[in-house]
Amino acid sequence: MVVNNNDLATFKIDNSFYPEIKLLITIKSFDLQAIRERYLKNKNKKSNRTGSVARREIATGGIAELTIKNGEITHSEVLTELPEPRGVDSFDEITAFSSENRVYLLNNNSITTITNPWFSYIHTIDIEKSQKKRMLVSSSGFDSIFEYSLEEQKKMFEWFAWENGFDHGLDPESGEKLFLTRNEEKAAQYEAEGKKYLFISDPAAQTLPTAKRAAFINSVVYDPVDKNNVIATFFHEGTVYEIDRNTGQAGKALGGLKNPHGGMKLEFNRYAGTSTTGGEIITGNTYSQTCYNFENLKGKQDFLIDMQWVQNTKIIE
């Protein structure tokens, strides 16, 4: 593996090369203190996995808009408050955003709600930009991906990690493998083999905390090069995968990331992802990588100590 490291603290600060930027963002929770306390509490789990170990009360967050000009925030406004919004995407007259286990679609001055019993902890939404007829949804709570038509709001595609080679998480208390399934016959097989398992038979009533998930797919986007593929980010494994929609097979595109978010394909055989707890943005593939490190930049609050958390990356054209 060839790695080229870049410390952003050594870069020159220049805010003159880009125009005014308008952003639409999600704020998962306004209670940042509670998030920090959960992180510290769960830091020493035996499974060594980042994330909550039990279902918690849903927090209130919001959708906000920001304007950045010459390196300064010149406008900020919370547009609405709702339960834990994470995913948001907007293109031309279409806007879609998520709230925990549902998707809201705004199109031509109308709003439609899309639900699915397997929607849980939705993290991202990606509108297909060329024809504007489809969107992808990452249902992180059940390690799954969905595609819906924008016009009819019909499900067009689904993919579950458990049924495509990623069939177990870890018990956060013991560190043992915990096999996951929504299939009754598979659950019976695990029972007969004496394996520890969790059978999700009623997704509306059952939940799967972050630390127990097999993949924790926290983003999925369309492949701009190959329409047969989608690009998904696996938080626990630290990998960006390229998933073939026809076969269900997942091929590793970018690895070695720490609790990543926001995987994407930049061009043929070149990908990008945010190595969140590594404090880096990484581009490249499985053979060669370029890393942009945020660790030494000024402005981090003292209580974070040596913790890094770079949540996501967007390409501004």
Which role fits each region the language model picked out?
Residues N6-D14, T80-D92, S120-I127, H168-D171, ...:
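Repeated scaffold domains used in trafficking and secretory/extracellular systems
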Residues P19-K22, D92-I94, S130-R134, V225-N229, ...:
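Short coil/turn segments that connect the beta-strands within blades of beta-propeller domains
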Residues I25-I58, F146, G169-D171, R182-S219:
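Short, conserved, GDST-rich strand-edge loop motifs in beta-rich repeat architectures
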Residues I25-K41, K46-R49, R55-E57, A96-E100, ...:
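Conserved beta-strand positions in repeat-built beta-propeller and related beta-rich domains
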Residues I63, V103-L105, D143-F146, G238-Y241, ...:
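Structural signal for beta-propeller blades
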Residues T67-G71, L106-S110, S149-Q153, D244-G248, ...:
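Short loop/turn segments that connect beta-strands within beta-propeller blades
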Residues N70-I127:
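Blade-loop segments of beta-propeller domains
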Residues E77-V78, M156-A215, Y287-M307:
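Surface-exposed loop and turn segments in beta-propeller and other repeat-based domains
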